[in-house]
């Protein structure tokens, strides 16, 4: 990489955007390295903290560090619906559904028209037994035109609720592995 010396902020942004491109191109190890480099140059950049922390938690890796990073991002940007969604989703992924609901409801207040946040809140509602509200959120997520690959998943949740096959919870996936004798 040939980037100008002494311009940490600009270089951090460059690594951050390249990391996003790599992550979306399914090149996770390169993306992770670039996100870490971006943080090295700007340790408190909330978008980088959020993106890397969310990515780790969504993959079920580095959960403690990912959660700390997202909390730092929320402290800096408490009114950013996407960052608050990340915190709610992090709680969901570790099985803390009550805190997930609280944060995801806040994220919806901030970004009501985002299909992913509505989908996340639907999942959290389902986990705390608020099934009618869950189906409403999923229907709303569907109507907000989610990414094409997400639409069949959302429609399956509307029809069947959360099942082991469509669950996004690390805790639920760990339980399934334990039940299947594959982990524990």
Regions found by a protein language model. Give the residues of each.
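Residue-level detector of the short coil/turn that links helix A to helix B
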Residues: 26, 60-61, 95, 129
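Position-specific recognition of the canonical hydrophobic site in helix A of tetratricopeptide repeat
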Residues: 23, 57-58, 92, 126
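Structural marker of alpha-solenoid helical repeat scaffolds
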Residues: 2-7, 41, 76, 110, ...
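Canonical tetratricopeptide repeat
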Residues: 17, 51, 86, 120, ...
């Amino acid at each position: 990489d040939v980037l100008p010396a002494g311009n940490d902020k600009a270089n951090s942004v460059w690594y951050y955007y390249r990391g996003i491109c790599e992550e979306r191109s399914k090149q996770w190890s390169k993306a992770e390295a670039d996100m870490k480099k971006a943080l090295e140059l700007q340790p408190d950049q909330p978008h980088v903290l959020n993106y890397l922390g969310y990515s780790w938690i969504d993959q079920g890796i580095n959960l403690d560090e990912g959660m700390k990073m997202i909390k730092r991002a929320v402290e800096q940007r408490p009114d950013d619906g996407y960052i608050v969604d990340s915190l709610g989703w992090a709680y969901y992924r570790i099985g803390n559904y009550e805190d997930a609901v609280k944060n995801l409801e806040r994220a919806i207040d901030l970004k009501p028209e985002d299909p992913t946040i509505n989908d996340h809140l639907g999942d959290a509602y389902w986990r705390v037994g608020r099934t009618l509200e869950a189906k409403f959120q999923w229907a709303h997520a569907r109507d907000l035109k989610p990414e094409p690959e997400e639409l069949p998943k959302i429609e399956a949740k509307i029809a069947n609720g959360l099942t082991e096959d469509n669950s996004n919870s690390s805790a639920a996936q760990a339980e399934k592995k334990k039940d299947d004798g594959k982990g524990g």
